[in-house]
Amino acid sequence: MEGIGDITVEKVETKIQETPISIETGYFAKQSNGAVIVRQGETAVFVAAVISEEAQADIDFLPLTVDYREKTYAYGKIPGGFVKREGKPTVREILVSRLIDRPIRPMFPKGFFNDVIITAMTLSADDKYDPDVLAIVGASAALHITEAPFEGPVAGVRVCRLDGEFIVNPTYEQRNRSDIDIVVAGTKDAIVMVEGGSEEVSEEVILDAILFAHEEIKKLCDLQEELRSKVGKEKITVEIDEEDERIKAELESIVRESVKEAFNILDKKERNKRIKEIYEEAIQKIEIPEEKEKKAEVIYKEIVSNIMREKVLKEKVRIDGRRPDEIRPIWIRTGLFPRIHGSAIFTRGQTQAFVATTLGAPGEEQIEESIEEGEEKKRFMLHYNFPPFSTGEARPPRAPSRREIGHGNLAERAIEPLIPDEEEFPYVIRVVSEILESNGSTSMATVCGASLSLFDAGVPMKKHVAGIAMGLLKEDDDYVILTDILGDEDHLGDMDFKVAGTRDGVTSIQMDIKIKGLSKEILQEALEQAKKARMHILDLMYKAMPQPRPELSPHAPKVITMRVLPEKIPVIIGPSGKNIKKIIDETGVKIDLDQEGLVRIYAVDGESADKAKEMIERLIMDIELGEVYMGKVTRVEDYGAFVELMPGKLSLLHVSQISPERIRSAKEKIKVGDILTVKVIDIDEMGRAKVSLKEVREGEEPKNKFLFE
C-alpha cells in the first residue's frame, strides 16, 4: 500500500493451520460505527457496521440486515451481460448474507431493537480462499469494536476432510477433492451455527469436524478481543422499560392458566384461535396506554412462548401430543400428473411438499458468475417456493425471498451427491418444490419429496435421501431435544437443526440457534436422534418407491449417446457444417460432438432422436457391396465418371456401366454436378468402389437418400 498523508492502522494477526489471517481498522469508513478488513492470502473482505441511535417500537425481533456483495473488480473481471455494473444480489451473495446473519443474530441481548446494518464487500479475491468465512469474522469484529451491546465475538471457519485429515479454511482445490465441506461458527465456548454438505459421511465424522473447527474458531475470537482492546468503544446497555414489565406481570397473572389449557388443544388452528381469544379477554382487564397497545401484543407472544417451553420441558409432551422423539404421520404419492417427467407429494403431519422433476438437454444449464471459476454451469438445480396459502395467509405471492433461496440451496446440497454424473445420465435436471402446507420442517419435506420425484422421473440415483429437522428447548441445565419440529416449536424454541442423508451417511447439515451456544453433548445427542428419525423416514420412502423407474417419461427429452471413430466427426459435420445442419433442420434435434468421437443427440421425442441417429449412422457407414446409393458426379473422363457416394468417398462409374447401349465417352451422358443413383458392383482391397448405373432396378431405395433431399 502506497500513498501520501499520515494514517493510523491497527492490525492484529494470527495463523489458522499455518496460514496467516489478519484484521485491520482505523483508516477507512470512519463514519460507520465500526469497519474492518479481514485478509487471508490475497483475499480481502471489507465489513462495516452501523447501528441506529433509536430503537424500533413495537417489535419482538432484532432488526438486523446483512448485505454481502462480491465485486467483479475483486477478481479482475468486468460484469458480463449488457449492463456493465453489479445489479441485484446473486444467489451466492444472498446465501453468504444469510451465512453471516445467522451466527451474529443470537449474540445480541433480549430487548435490543435498534437497527443494525452489516455491509460486507469482497475487495480482493484470489484463486485459493473463499471470502465467505472471512466475512463472518469481519462482521463480528466490526460489531465487537462498536458501542453496540454485541455479546460476541464469534468467528466462522470452513472445515474439509482430505485423505482422512481435517483442514480448516482450505483452498478451492482442496475443497474440490474433499468429502466434507462445512462452515462452522461459534464463540470461544460453544458452537453457534453449522452449514454444509458431505458425501455420505457418518455422524461421528461430522461431529469430529465441527469440534476440530472450534479449536481454530477460538483463535479468531481471541484475535478480535485483541483488536477490541486497542480500538473498542464502550458498550451501551439495554434499559428495561418499567411500564413493559408492569404490563407483562399483570398480563401473565391473568392468562397463564388459560394459555396452559389452550396448549392441550392439538389442532394448530383451533389452538391459535383460542390463544388469540385469551388475549382479547385479558386486555379488557388491565390498563394499557394507547402507545403500548402494539407492544402489549409482543409481550403476550413472549408469555405464550415461555408457557409452551415450560410445559414441554416439564411434561416431556409436545403441543400436538407427541413424545419428544416422535415423528408425525407420513403419507407419500408419486406419479401424480402424466405430463410431468417426475412428481411426488410428501406429507408429514401438516407439512406438505409437491415436488416436480424436469429433464432438459445441454444448453439449459444455469449459468452463474463465481469468484472461483468465473462462469459456472449448474447441471442440477433445486428451487423451493413457499406461497402464502401454505400457512393460510391472505396475501399475494412475491418474488423468491432470501429464506426460499436458502431452503432451496439446503435441499439441493442434500440431493446433489447422489445425482449421477453426466457420462451416466446426460440430462440437465431441475427440481421444483411447491410447499402446499406448512407447519414446520418444509425444507426437509422438500428433500424427501425431491428424492421421490427424481426416482419417479427415472433418474438413476443409487439411494434415497431423507431429511429431518430437530429442535431444542433449554433452560439452564434442563433441556429436551425435539424430533420433526412444528412451526411453533421452531419459532419458540432455541434451535433449528436440520440433517439430511442416506442410510449410509450425512449429505447436508444446517444448524441455527437462538441461544449463545451449544455444547458437544447436546450436539452429539441431536445427531444421534436425527439419524434414528432419518432411518424411519427412509424405510417409508423405500416402501413407496424402492428404486428409480426403469424408463423415462414418454414426455421427457430423448437422449441418445453414440461412439464413433474420431475421424468420422468431420464427416458428420460436413463442409461448412452442411451435414449436421441438414440433420438438425430435418429432425429438430440438438447434437453435441467432441473430438474423442462422442456423439450425443437430444430430442423432444424418441422418434426424432431415432431418425437423427439413423441419419448419422448412414452418413458414417462404410460402402457395402450390392447396395444402392445416390452420389454426386465430381469429375468426368471419356472412360468414366467419379461419383461421391459419401463425403470423401469416391467411386468409379465406368463408361460400360452407364447404359445398356454402347457409348464411346461418359461425357455423352454425364456431366459434373449430376446426381445419380448407382449400385456398388465391386470393392477392391483398398476399399475403392466401382458402381453401375445400368444395374439399378426400379424401386430400389438409395441408403443415403437423405443427404440429397
Curated annotation (Swiss-Prot):
Its main location: cytoplasm. One of its GO terms (cellular component) is cytosol. Disulfide bonds: none annotated. Residues 626-694 form the S1 motif domain. Keywords: Cytoplasm, Magnesium, Metal-binding, Nucleotidyltransferase, RNA-binding, Transferase. Residues 557-616 form the KH domain. It catalyses: RNA(n+1) + phosphate = RNA(n) + a ribonucleoside 5'-diphosphate. Its cofactor is Mg(2+). One of its GO terms (molecular function) is RNA binding. It comes from Persephonella marina (strain DSM 14350 / EX-H1). The keyword RNA-binding applies. This is Polyribonucleotide nucleotidyltransferase. The gene is pnp. One of its GO terms (biological process) is mRNA catabolic process. It is found in: Cytoplasm. It comes from the Bacteria.
